Amino acid sequence: MKHLLSTHDLHRGAAIQILDTAEEMASVTEREVKKLPALRGRTVVNLFFEDSTRTRISFEAAAKRLSADVINFAAKGSSVSKGESLKDTAQTLEAMSADAVVIRHGASGAPQRLADSGWIDAAVINAGDGTHEHPTQALLDAFTMRRHWAKIFGVSSVGSDVAGMRVAIVGDVLHSRVARSNVWLLHTLGAQVTLVAPPTLLPIGVQTWPCAVSFDLDQTLDAGVDAVMMLRVQGERMHAAFFPSEREYSRRWGFDDARLARLDALGLDETIIMHPGPMNRGLEISSAAADSSRSTVLDQVRNGVSVRMAALYLLLSGGLQQPDQSNPQRNVTNTSNWQETKR
């Protein structure tokens, strides 16, 4: 597997391999000298056509901790702002012998186009394309969930998936590439996913996704959840009124102080609250929830570096598993590690 473009196409074996490799990379981030020589002499280009803070810095840190040379490219202030095409930009990077291109683009499908075009021979990693996908965010979210459950049950997370976990993804699903990537990856890893949103913020065809759909957050919490992932309301992508008011949205679909207390009342002591960031505090999540002991927001940021180190290393070393078409069972990981313990 040369590229990482979508979790839809990521088979179970490769996903587990990335998560397990990320565990090894996490030990590097805990050292005083956070550096490995694994990608020395390789060049990684961060090609960002959209604004980003967390993802760009995370990929830069990941590449540098593997000793790769990093080139940061931003569309603003570059020839792209003068009308240069993606093809011309890609061919320029090819002439500079880039080994990997991490691309974020406002157009859904741009990373796939770059990977399939033949314009560049580098590995391509999708860092978010339009409202389509954001695979490394989903991987770091799964990594965070897997680690949390392993800690609870006192077992190693290595080799395990998240089978049996109940995950609610709440909010602006329509505009969220994070939601799409998480639905596909978590389904592959065995989790039970429920999307919770107003009808106006659910995409057409969501009924075909491998998840349940609910319009009632309180009802979903009452049914029991192990992780609640709040999504940012993406006002910059909204050109119509998708809900009556921010107050109404927060009351019905925001994770406020009352819902934080509701988890305690329901006895859901180990339920975690997640958010991919950036957060709209007071809209989809209250400050009390974001800063609570249940929150994994900073863990997600921390884990993102380890997961992206793993992705870069496996893609550039050629070590990422290919699906075994002759024996599909080899792509299925044993999930009994803590599922038996949980029972």
UniProtKB/Swiss-Prot annotation:
Carbamoyl phosphate binds at residues 54-55, 104, 134, 137, 277-278. It holds the Pfam family OTCace. Residues 323-343 are annotated as: Disordered. It catalyses: carbamoyl phosphate + L-aspartate = N-carbamoyl-L-aspartate + phosphate + H(+). GO terms for molecular function: amino acid binding; aspartate carbamoyltransferase activity. GO terms for biological process: 'de novo' pyrimidine nucleobase biosynthetic process; 'de novo' UMP biosynthetic process; amino acid metabolic process. L-aspartate binds at residues 82, 177, 232. Its EC number is 2.1.3.2. One of its GO terms (cellular component) is cytosol. Pathway: Pyrimidine metabolism; UMP biosynthesis via de novo pathway; (S)-dihydroorotate from bicarbonate: step 2/3. Signal peptide: none annotated. Keywords: Pyrimidine biosynthesis, Transferase. Belongs to the aspartate/ornithine carbamoyltransferase superfamily. ATCase family. Catalyzes the condensation of carbamoyl phosphate and aspartate to form carbamoyl aspartate and inorganic phosphate, the committed step in the de novo pyrimidine nucleotide biosynthesis pathway. Heterododecamer (2C3:3R2) of six catalytic PyrB chains organized as two trimers (C3), and six regulatory PyrI chains organized as three dimers (R2). This is Aspartate carbamoyltransferase catalytic subunit.
